[in-house]
UniProtKB/Swiss-Prot annotation:
It holds the Pfam family UDPGP. InterPro entries: Nucleotide-diphossugar_trans, UDPGP_fam, UDPGP_trans. The keyword GTP-binding does not apply. SUPFAM superfamilies: Nucleotide-diphospho-sugar transferases. Substrate binds at G110, G111, H215, N243, I244, D245. This is Probable UTP--glucose-1-phosphate uridylyltransferase.
Length: 499
């Protein structure tokens, strides 16, 4: 956890809080023990381990809550040159096969495509050229193995939401000469806010009563699934981990050889912040240690400073390089104390509203838990993340080309930040996005684009500079075919083309 400043409390208050923690923890432990004892899951041992890990997380949450901790903002400072390594200073890799033979690749595949209006795993969304995130990721590894005559395993960390569908889709790759495997992250019980009791009363039970605990669970899941032992037995002692929706996260030989030669246990790729990244987690120096800081950990009065690209200039890409024996060590010795991110929401159970809480962790917060860590400043093309329809729209345009599964930016845009694209709710779902913009405009010279309202595009549209397009309320605004828009504002209603 972050270094904390403690609120001073009277002894009577502290005693009361200690009793409250003890009662809540004891009650939760009893309920979890009942779940395990009466469970009908196929792997009772693994389920028991997961409930033990959840209880440890819950108990830490209770302790941190009742002690009244707040973030000590004064101990946090932005990264300086001495806190990171610039990618341009890394030596070139001279023996690719030697290093690749020690590597495995994990893609984080726990998310569904709900934010893009689909009810299947996000990895299966078509990105471009009739290829999904999963297709592109596998193409990368297939090319890497073929080019260097190696066998880098490709592994997916699924959640219970994505596991079944993903395993079905993977059958189509049966003929590929790639070692493809999966493991599943933990399943933790949601907790009622009022009673502080777990929502599920049995296991298994409806999936709505459970939640995936975030990608910080990868460390426990790697060990308890047996994945680490299997990889180490194959001579694979380094892992490259990234989000499956980051289309720039391919294996980089210079980074790989650097972390191996320097025996780095944990390396995080960071990149320059842009105006599109104001809420993305950042790497900071706190009391001489590298730490990940997320938006919800920042005191309200410092949010503006946190989001500024003038103060905190580098963001976490979630591209992480791990030394597997070190992962095994910190898990088995129970050395991991990842920052807890509680999330409260209102859901319906038995047609009645109920407030529930989930406790998640992030892989990035583990950087402070390993012995030899670093941040590597990489160029923006290694962070092409697709979180919403605006991002998907951008990666489908002519700014990018697909090269053996990796997205490569046009040479003319190298060194420049990608365009900032903002779209209103009319474009939120994939189906609506493709209906309204069936033909991708040219955006090689675009700086920013803002679209709002009932807007449609024709064919062969060219966008340059800063563009704002706003349809008047209750009207349709159609951008005609062959239109060239440059540094302009388009408003009103106009329907002079075939939509």
């Amino acid at each position: 956890m972050l270094h904390r400043r403690i609120h001073f409390k009277s002894q009577s208050t502290l005693d009361f809080d200690s009793v409250a923690v003890s009662i809540s923890a004891s009650t939760m432990k009893n309920e979890l023990d009942k779940l395990v004892l009466n469970s009908r899951v196929s792997d009772k041992k693994t389920f028991g381990i997961q409930m033990d890990n959840f209880f440890a997380l819950y108990r830490r949450y209770l302790l941190h809550t009742v002690k009244g901790y707040e973030c000590d903002w004064d101990s946090i400072r932005p990264l300086g040159p001495e806190d990171m390594i610039d990618y341009g200073d890394l030596p070139l890799c001279k023996n690719a096969g030697k290093y690749l033979n020690r590597l495995a690749v994990v893609k984080l595949n726990g998310g569904m495509g709900n934010a893009l209006g689909v009810n299947y795993p996000k990895a299966m969304i078509e990105v471009r050229d009739n290829q999904s995130f999963l297709d592109l990721s596998i193409r990368q590894i297939e090319y890497l193995n073929r080019r260097y005559d190696v066998s880098v395993p490709f592994i997916l960390m699924n959640s219970y939401d994505t596991n079944d569908e993903t395993c079905k889709v993977l059958r189509k790759y049966a003929g590929c000469k790639i070692d493809i495997s999966t493991f599943e992250q933990s399943r933790y019980p949601r907790v009622f806010v009022d009673s502080q009791l777990p929502v599920p009363k049995a296991a298994p039970s409806p999936i709505e009563e459970w939640y995936p605990p975030g990608h910080g669970d990868i460390f426990d899941a790697l060990v308890h699934s047996g994945t680490i032992e299997r990889l180490l037995a194959q001579g694979k002692d380094y892992l490259f981990v990234s989000n499956i929706d980051n289309l720039g996260a391919s294996v980089d030989l210079n980074i790989l050889s650097h972390v191996i030669d320097n025996q780095i246990e944990y390396s995080m790729e960071i990149t320059d912040k842009t105006k599109a990244d104001i809420k993305v987690g950042i790497l900071v120096n706190q009391d001489g240690l590298l730490r990940l800081l997320e938006t919800n950990q920042v005191p309200e009065q410092h949010r503006e400073e946190f989001m500024s690209d003038k103060v905190f200039k580098y963001i976490n890409t979630n591209n992480v390089w791990l030394y597997l024996p070190a992962v095994k060590r910190v898990v088995e010795n129970r050395e991991l104390n990842l920052d807890i991110m509680p999330n409260i929401e209102t859901v319906y159970y038995n047609n009645e509203p109920a407030r529930i809480i989930e406790f998640t962790t992030a892989i990035g917060s583990a950087i402070s838990q390993f012995k030899k860590t670093e941040g590597i400043r990489v160029s923006r093309p290694r962070f092409i993340s697709v979180k919403n329809s605006s991002d998907l729209f951008l990666v489908r345009c002519d700014l990018y080309n697909v090269d053996h599964g990796s997205l490569k930016i046009e040479e003319s845009r190298l060194g420049f930040p990608p365009p900032v694209v903002r779209m209103s709710n009319e474009f939120k779902d994939i189906a609506e996005l493709f209906c309204r913009i069936p033909y991708m405009p040219s955006m090689k010279d675009l700086v920013s684009l803002s679209i709002s309202g009932n807007v449609y595009f024709g064919r062969n549209v060219i966008l340059k500079g800063n563009i704002v397009i706003v349809a008047s309320e209750n009207t349709i605004l159609c951008i005609p075919s062959n239109a060239v828009l440059e540094n302009c504002v388009v408003t009103g209603n106009c329907k002079i083309m075939e939509c």
